[in-house]
Amino acid sequence: MTQAADTDIRVGQPEMVTLTIDGVEISVPKGTLVIRAAELMGIQIPRFCDHPLLEPVGACRQCLVEVEGQRKPLASCTTVATDDMVVRTQLTSEIADKAQHGVMELLLINHPLDCPMCDKGGECPLQNQAMSNGRTDSRFTEAKRTFAKPINISAQVLLDRERCILCARCTRFSDQIAGDPFIDMQERGALQQVGIYADEPFESYFSGNTVQICPVGALTGTAYRFRARPFDLVSSPSVCEHCASGCAQRTDHRRGKVLRRLAGDDPEVNEEWNCDKGRWAFTYATQPDVITTPLIRDGGDPKGALVPTSWSHAMAVAAQGLAAARGRTGVLVGGRVTWEDAYAYAKFARITLGTNDIDFRARPHSAEEADFLAARIAGRHMAVSYADLESAPVVLLVGFEPEDESPIVFLRLRKAARRHRVPVYTIAPFATGGLHKMSGRLIKTVPGGEPAALDDLATGAVGDLLATPGAVIIVGERLATVPGGLSAAARLADTTGARLAWVPRRAGERGALEAGALPTLLPGGRPLADEVARAQVCAAWHIAELPAAAGRDADGILAAAADETLAALLVGGIEPADFADPDAVLAALDATGFVVSLELRHSTVTERADVVFPVAPTTQKAGAFVNWEGRYRTFEPALRGSTLQAGQSDHRVLDALADDMGVHLGVPTVEAAREELAALGIWDGKHAAGPHIAATGPTQPEAGEAILTGWRMLLDEGRLQDGEPYLAGTARTPVVRLSPDTAAEIGAADGEAVTVSTSRGSITLPCSVTDMPDRVVWLPLNSAGSTVHRQLRVTIGSIVKIGAGS
């Protein structure tokens, strides 16, 4: 009997080899490891060090098999299948079975009997394989080796060295996948052990993966340690809500409380990895300030205290206030909502409030960005995928730092560079640690000079690479703050034929774009200005007409609210601190006659609202996020039942509110929203050209001044990290970055305090002298001691003052 292995064939038919395993012939692609060939036949060879995404090392020797013609058993995880090879596993060979029993006995000699208290107990490969491939008793009578435990690898990862079997999974992940030197094998022989670098700071965003892939309980998570047993938990597949990567994950919970998250196995997206933020930042949904009941102003007094009320009463008050302001109402929806919720906001704005004043971009943005999204991104699903990054002849990044802003994109780019030699270029002020890990190349640029740099790339070596089929240009949301930046990126893509991808920072932004939560776009990427597009939406929504005039963007909505042009605001999940001037946002809310807020937790927005509706976190509702690729990532509620808080999905709240206003919204469930979106489909008409915005060029600062640049670090002061102190403990130290000449100009040395200031505030941090353009200053935008929007009231690209000292 002969079996043929299924193979992902990209180019042509791979060369095959045929071997025999346990008496059965199988044909596999040349280069396949014996252990993989056995897996294709359903034969499970025990192993510890082997992992399909790590390079083979043969460290544990547990996978020994007998190979005909060899003098001794071979490790199947390092042995490559060859033509006519005859392999016998433990199922048919006494030699292989005896060898595996011997290795297991050796591994257990010093392993402690911690199973009753070990976090890995119940899901431990060592425990399971000791039962299936080990002895029933031990012949070892000497004292076991012991170590002091645990050792803090970081604030959130603990190491029990005496449990370690030296499989090197964690160290290989550190070196091969993350590129972070945070854990290594130390000493030799009987003294060999896993340890950390004493002189290297722990700065990995991916350390939690070592806990998950550890085949024993040597590495454990601080937050989960001694909290539960695997067999006590209910596991639910879910999707990460923290960024646009779209990671699959598993949520483990008990009695209505989430206890841990693990990376899900999705080869097309995150493979088997996730970042530490996605793994551990979930306690925000159970903080004491979670809203559990609708709130209204006491006695209807706009200055009265917020008091609890019934859903029906809150609906009646909100409906009355919004109906009175119909046609003079704006909708602000943050980038964290699901695709279905964003669709409900977009539909509610148009048919219930009669306005196109809606925007999901609760952050610095521009009209150029809206044009770019309409022309190049909306309605174009999967134009670039994760797989495309691996096979691209070149990847160009602009306005985007993947390690901080989309960690799984970073891991895939690092894999592309390391395994496939894909060159990665970035247009940025300086080379980051992430760029070095991707073996990337810097195109050093002053903030504001990105359009000129992009235009220059059209000719030359990089332009030639971009003209190669499959080349990719990735732009981040920060490029929206550079006049002409997105226009130049689109122009370069048109000139070279490179594919264009947009990676926002938040999980819900791409879905909100596709749902039509923009002042110039309808669902499916339909241009509002197109009469046919409006007619299609009218037919789907069973209405006579839609408001045709382009609406205001988020900044315009807030400005109109501040001068009382708008009489009411409907706000869902925005953070004023994400805007360039948070004080202006709060002032606009204060000036608005009637504010309805849909929110998970109390905030500066709910403090100013007239009606507050509690909404559910992602663990308690169904929905979908659309990741940066345009891939739909659906999920069901992990937590169900009477123990949950009273929040509802945004779309359910809006559907009920529309009913109270005499309008049938038709989205009471996610299924109803998805059916409507599927019926609408993607716009197949003409997309707008552009954008075509002229670049203004970088501003020229004087002595003692600098152009501000920066981005948000992955681990920062974001509200979705609230309640997770261990994760906050590994956030990177905030610094001010200056060039050597600029630091010398203001009299600051490396490590000394530097103050960055505007007329409205200042930030003082240690100086990190960096190879970057002169009179440019870099700050983390939302880290401890450096919340730029709140403290300076400006955003990147602005001129700020710099000086030595506090």
From Swiss-Prot:
[4Fe-4S] cluster 2 binds at C164, C167, C170, C214. [4Fe-4S] cluster 3 binds at C240, C243, C247, C275. InterPro entries: 2Fe-2S_ferredoxin-like_sf, 2Fe-2S_ferredoxin-type, Asp_de-COase-like_dom_sf, MoPterin_dinucl-bd_dom, Mopterin_OxRdtase, Mopterin_OxRdtase_4Fe-4S_dom, NADH_UbQ_OxRdtase_75kDa_su_CS, NADH_UbQ_OxRdtase_ferredoxin. The modification N-acetylthreonine is found at T2. GO terms for cellular component: membrane; peptidoglycan-based cell wall; plasma membrane. Its EC number is 7.1.1.-. Belongs to the complex I 75 kDa subunit family. This is NADH-quinone oxidoreductase subunit G. It comes from Mycobacterium tuberculosis (strain ATCC 25618 / H37Rv).
